[in-house]
Curated annotation (Swiss-Prot):
Species this chain originates from: Mannheimia succiniciproducens (strain KCTC 0769BP / MBEL55E)
InterPro entries cross-referenced by the UniProt entry: ARFGAP/RecO (IPR037278), DNA_rep/recomb_RecO_N (IPR022572), NA-bd_OB-fold (IPR012340), RecO (IPR003717), RecO_C (IPR042242)
Protein name: DNA repair protein RecO
GO BP annotations, alphabetical order: DNA recombination; double-strand break repair
UniProt-listed Pfam families: RecO_C, RecO_N
Domain of life: Bacteria
Role: Involved in DNA repair and RecF pathway recombination.
GO cellular component term, pick one: bacterial nucleoid
Family per record: Belongs to the RecO family.
Keywords: DNA damage, DNA recombination, DNA repair
Length: 228
């Protein structure tokens, strides 16, 4: 389950991400009622066995039961899970089957559950895989200007729809060649590469997310400020 919200006095609208049908929205009738078994079942980060009916964009949920126990996401890992859910909700078209992304999603959540407060590698890996699914083709290994292989000691500036071009300009869009090589390998073992990867994915995902802020990011920021 990616997200849920009230619908009428007794029901819920539920956004789901499924292996065979992709992302879809279902109406869970009576799920808000006091005696409804669905209320406790429809929780984030719980693998579910589902059944639904309907041919319109809004399906009717007819069955939901846990397929396994909920992944124990806490603190930073919990907010990271909400972020991943929101990414899928915002950028993946409804009812577009993508079994590989579903497996990547499960792998990401499992990694978050294991790492808890060290979440950055799992998030960056998922973001890169998501960009690949979206058809975001960028060559990390060659300069877009000259076609030459990137030099690990040189700097390259990212230009949307073109790629990375050798540049002496130093700003938020500039990356070392060694960082680009690590991006290609999805090797985020070094702290500097992790930081660079975060800069890149924020830029690369922006065309898909638009200007609307991510609610999960705002919630995390508000929580940190409250704790301070």
């Amino acid at each position: 389950m990616l997200h849920r919200k009230p619908y009428s006095e007794t029901s819920l609208l539920v956004d789901l991400f499924t292996e065979e049908s992709g992302r879809l929205t279902v109406l869970a009738k009576g799920a808000r009622a006091k005696r409804s078994a669905l209320k406790s079942v429809l929780q984030p980060f719980t693998p579910l066995l589902l059944r639904w009916t309907g041919k319109s964009s809004l399906k009717i949920l007819t069955k939901a039961e846990p397929a396994a126990i909920a992944l124990p996401l806490q603190q930073t890992a919990l907010f990271s899970g909400f972020y991943v859910n929101e990414l899928i909700t915002r950028v993946i078209e409804p009812e577009t089957p993508n079994p590989q992304l579903f497996q990547d999603y499960l792998h990401c959540l499992t990694s978050l559950a294991v790492s808890q407060n060290f979440v950055e590698p799992a998030l960056r890996e998922f973001e890169f895989k998501l960009l690949n699914i979206l058809g975001y083709g960028v060559d990390f290994l060659h300069c877009a200007g000259s076609g030459e292989p990137v030099d690990e000691n040189m700097t390259y500036r990212y230009r949307e729809e073109k790629g990375f071009i050798a540049s002496l300009i130093k700003d938020n869009l500039t990356f070392f060649g060694r960082e680009l090589i690590a991006f290609e390998r999805q090797d985020f073992s070094e702290k500097s590469v992790l930081q660079a990867a975060k800069r890149f994915t924020r830029v690369a995902l922006k065309p898909y997310l638009g200007n609307k802020p991510l609610k999960s990011r705002e919630l995390f920021t508000q929580t940190i400020l409250h704790l301070k």
